[in-house]
Amino acid sequence: ESEKMVSEKHTQGRVNFWGYMYGYYFAPKRSYCATDDPEKEFKTFIKKLHQAGIACIMEMYFPRECNPVTTLRALQFWKLYYHVDGFHVLGEGVSAKLLMHDGVLSDTRLMFHDFDESQIRKKKKPEDKCIAQYNPGFLQDMRRFLKSDEDMVSAAAYHIRRNPNIYAVINYMACQDGFTMNDMVTYNYRHNEANQENNQDGSSYNYSWNCGVEGASADPEVEGLRRRLVKNAFATLLCSRGPAMFFAGDEFCNTQFGNNNAYCQDNIISWLDWNRLDEYKEIHDFVRFMIHFR
């Protein structure tokens, strides 16, 4: 089985909650909107983000059957029409070189899982770099370091100090495709039974440790250890040189109950449980402190 995180999802009659599919590249999703005018609403949304000093990075999926020129036109459209600041592009229909060399996208943040470094247009100043690599190696090695696997010190040191001059590396300990940060210290094994695929979907390589108990525990020692590990994970992530990304809800230990592939779960498995914000206020306050420290 491949260690790579899965990108293309086959719903087999279930809801495609993540939306990874071919097509509809030039229209905002109406069901996400509160009004009957999704174009105006999305434009207003972007404007409000910019007024608050927040950039908008869209994730878009282009499978093999998608023409790379269509990919280019889609990104140009969202940049010019909606003023989106950047894109995390997925799928085999993506030509990184075509996107990186396009004049319209020259100052746009572009994030890829892989690309040829020699094809990057170099900026005059390192701080102006706008090409980034999603860095699953950080997740894999730092999770192993966190749970004290052998011979991980040198790998951890490499990831902490890694910050290339001509492109960025996006460091993260969790994303939507895998365990949440809470679940990485709560489960040794995936629990994807709700996906109705006999628990065979999702990665088997989670680099997690349940601290001695599989799943939720009322033992204060187990719970205390898990909270310390989550704090260590955030401290390591936010003290590393590359840009840090964390999954929404990790700042208050949101759980997916061990499901590491919640692509078809439009329910409490993948929703954010905001009640945990009070229960895990200690973690939330620590994350805020670390962001300020960074």
Model segments located where?
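Long, K/E/R/D-enriched contiguous segments that form extended
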Residues: 274-276
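A structural motif corresponding to the C-terminal end of an alpha-helix
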Residues: 45-56, 81-83, 236-243, 289, ...
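Aromatic- and acidic-residue-enriched carbohydrate-binding clefts of CAZyme catalytic domains
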Residues: 5-51, 64-81, 194-215, 266-269
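Conserved hydrophobic/aromatic pocket- or pore-lining residues that grip, position, or stack substrates
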Residues: 1, 25, 59
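Conserved alpha/beta catalytic core and glycan-binding cleft of carbohydrate-active enzymes
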Residues: 96-248, 252, 261-265
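Active-site neighborhood of glycoside hydrolase catalytic domains
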Residues: 40-41, 48-124
